A protein has these predicted regions:
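Rossmann-like NAD(P) dinucleotide-binding subdomain of oxidoreductase/dehydrogenase enzymes
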Residues: 121-265, 387
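Conserved C-terminal structural/oligomerization subdomain of aldehyde/semialdehyde dehydrogenase
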Residues: 28-34, 219, 256, 310-311, ...
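Hydrophobic face of amphipathic alpha-helices that form TPR/SEL1-like repeat modules
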Residues: 1-27
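ALDH superfamily catalytic-core signature
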Residues: 229-367, 396, 430, 478-479
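Structural signal for hydrophobic packing residues in well-ordered secondary-structure cores
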Residues: 54, 58, 73-80, 84, ...
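Residue-level signal for inorganic ion chemistry
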Residues: 29, 65, 87, 109, ...
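Glycine-rich loop-to-alpha-helix module at the N-terminal edge of alpha/beta enzyme cores
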Residues: 32-119, 130
Length: 481
């Protein structure tokens, strides 16, 4: 049985004040590995080492930091299939999703490496005569990241590698359900010969590791992906030390399908957005708002496709829907369905589960009286909602406290370009899925979906602060004092 030690300040060590936990496969409950978790002593060791190591790292030339990150990416790419198998075993990711996640993570690491050379500054056209005025970007210092279980490797990397690229040191607390994904990051950084002390991976409970990182004044920023409830708690605690924070939280993402859309293409787009990775994606399409003229035809074709989705062993390359992260999530979805059906919704297919496997589920006639209209589901379920026209569709789209991603499917690009700015989400994708990513675009939401933006130069913005510098080269006459 594999046993993973803590990666503490660049060294693999046994835990002293934490525990050794069982990391289990959500598909069958089998033991994947034993994992050492951090306690108070390990957190303190990691913070002290990271604070001490950061100035030398920040002082390196950009190409020196870039070299370390590129070597880490090469190591990950060389072990792509092995790491994908770990993702399948630990998180229940289907084979297709796991392979894609590792490949995309390699791209993220290389994108972060490229940003090392792009961290810029600028000249200020100052109105003070005899003075040169300019600004620079500087690293924050020590940054901590708290990552989720759904895209555990990719979202760990998106935090860690951009943070390091900007010249910071970094402490990662991976999700308790997927600690090995954080350990993979540590293995890659070790292969890249990252200097000792700069990075620690600290699996462990949020109440011990997470709270300690959020509340410690030596940590200058928290970057978090997860639930809105936990993110709000982090913001509250971080405010006590005036700590910066970046929060990427929940979503109840709508796809609007207008009456002029290609229905077959709209179904394909919504099917992917709703059921890829069992719907356990913050951007998952969980509300499909369809104009009434095509509502019945769209629903019929969507139902046919959902019924044919293959659920089963995530190691099987043909599997589309694997297990949820744990069986508790199944019970939450059951309650959503029960409430919706009692208020007039129709359960077209699914609504059953065995262990952590939840059958692909489709509801129609969902309305604003139902909890599922507003609540994130985080499972293989989506709702079809009828709209009278495009303006009604927009109203239904915006009636939610979340605002992460949205889609608009139509052949009328003039109408699409008019509607997109009025859709209350951080990202709008016209004729594409709500599930979209880019290494250069600003990823993030509005409302209760979060604060800040990440990816590419926007991540560098999050991990640096600006400093204004002036140089006086002519005498200045001050007022008489």
């Amino acid at each position: 049985m594999k046993e993973y030690k803590l990666f503490l300040a660049g060294e693999w060590t046994d835990t002293e004040t934490g525990k050794i936990i069982d990391d289990k496969n959500p598909a069958d409950g089998s033991l994947v590995a034993k994992v050492h978790t951090a306690g108070p002593k390990e957190v303190e060791t990691a913070i002290t080492a990271a604070v001490n190591a950061q100035p030398a790292w920040a002082a390196l030339l950009p190409e020196q930091r870039e070299k370390v990150l590129l070597k880490a990416a090469d190591h990950m790419e060389a072990n792509l299939e092995y790491y994908a198998q770990l993702l399948i075993d630990e998180s229940g990711s289907a084979f297709m999703k796991a392979m894609d996640e590792v490949a995309q993570t390699v791209n993220i690491v290389r994108a972060a490496a490229g940003e090392c050379r792009r961290i810029d500054g600028g000249i200020v056209p100052d109105d003070n005569a005899g003075e040169l005025s300019y600004w620079i970007r500087q690293p924050l210092g020590l940054v901590a990241g708290i990552s989720p279980f759904n895209y555990p490797l990719l979202l760990c990397a998106n935090k860690v590698f951009f943070g390091l690229a900007a010249g910071n040191s970094f402490i990662l607390k991976p999700a308790s359900d997927t600690p090995i994904s954080g350990i993979i990051i540590a293995e890659c950084l070790e292969a890249g010969e990252l200097p000792k002390g700069l990075f620690s991976c600290l699996p462990g409970p949020g109440s011990i590791v997470g709270d300690a990182l959020v509340e410690d004044e030596r940590i200058k920023k928290i970057t978090f992906t997860g639930s809105t409830a936990v993110g709000s708690s982090i913001a509250e605690k971080a405010a006590k030390t005036l700590k910066k924070y970046h929060l990427e939280m929940g979503g109840k993402n709508p796809a609007i399908v207008l009456k002029d859309a290609n229905i077959d293409k709209a179904v394909e787009t919504c099917l992917f957005g709703a059921y890829f990775h069992q719907g356990q994606i913050c951007m998952a399409t969980s509300r499909i708002i369809v104009e009434e003229e095509i509502y019945d035809e769209f629903t019929e074709k969507m139902l046919e496709r959902v019924k044919n989705l293959k659920m089963g062993d995530p190691h099987d390359p043909m599997t589309i829907v694997g297990p949820l992260i744990n069986a508790n999530q199944c019970e939450f979805i059951d309650e959503q369905i029960k409430d919706a059906v009692s208020k007039g919704a129709t359960l077209l297919t699914g609504g059953t589960h065995e262990g952590a496997f939840y059958a692909p589920t489709l509801l129609k006639d969902v309305t604003q009286e139902m909890n599922i209209f507003y609540e994130e589901s985080f499972g293989p379920i989506t709702s079809i909602i009828k709209a009278k026209d495009s303006e009604d569709a927009l109203r239904l789209c915006n009636d939610n406290s979340y605002g992460l991603s949205s889609a608009l499917i139509t052949n009328d690009l003039s109408k699409a370009l008019s509607m997109a700015p009025r859709m209350e989400s951080g990202m709008v994708h016209i004729n594409d899925s709500t599930v979209m990513g880019s290494r250069r675009a600003p990823f993030g939401g509005v409302k209760k979906s979060g604060t800040g933006r990440e990816d590419g130069p926007f991540s560098i913005d999050e991990f640096t602060e600006l400093k204004w510098i002036t140089i006086r080269y002519e005498d200045k006459q001050f007022p008489p004092m």
